Amino acid sequence: HRRYIELCPNINEQFKFFKRVIYENLGIIEFDTLIERLKTEKRALCIVNTKKCAQQLYEQLSGDGVYHLSTSMYPKHRKKILAQIKERMSDKSKSCVLISTSLVEAGVDLDFNSVYRQVAGVDSVIQAAGRCNREGIEKKENSKVYIFDINGMKTVPGQSLQSSITKGLLQDLSLIHIS
């Protein structure tokens, strides 16, 4: 008979902070549908798997309060854009939509009401969700992470296994206890 020591007492209380968003699987959607959804958002981050897709989305959405980040940009330029985004987001009355590649998933302190994440590995989806209701101030019902794939867009080489695992999990969200 073995004895176990609970390393994380009050586990439900400890992890309550991580249950600050609702995940929604949008499935396969059209590129134009994604654009229309993003146009209705007040504060949203959309992370796609390729620089080309990020650029195309940005060009379709471009306007006041729409920003684009990718690894194609020089670090100094990205830093300047991040500063502009933070400045804009400091005024709650202004909208802000950021189109990016996975570079914003870690090490970027931004907080959005909605995050759209193109299907990728589960770790990437979780990292993206970390940009939604980051402070835990908003109600969970107002903090959504939308997972989608774009109709006709090929999976990035090297990501097909991770993406297929995520797609399998998304078929039954109850398996991963995230809402």
Where is each model-derived feature located?
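A short beta-strand-to-loop transition that corresponds to the Sensor-1 phosphate-sensing loop
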Residues: 1, 50-51, 101-103
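Conserved two-lobed SF2 helicase motor
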Residues: 91-104
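Interdomain hinge/linker at the junction between the two RecA-like core domains of SF2 helicases
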Residues: 1-37
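Generic structural signal for residues in well-ordered beta-strands
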Residues: 21-23, 66, 145
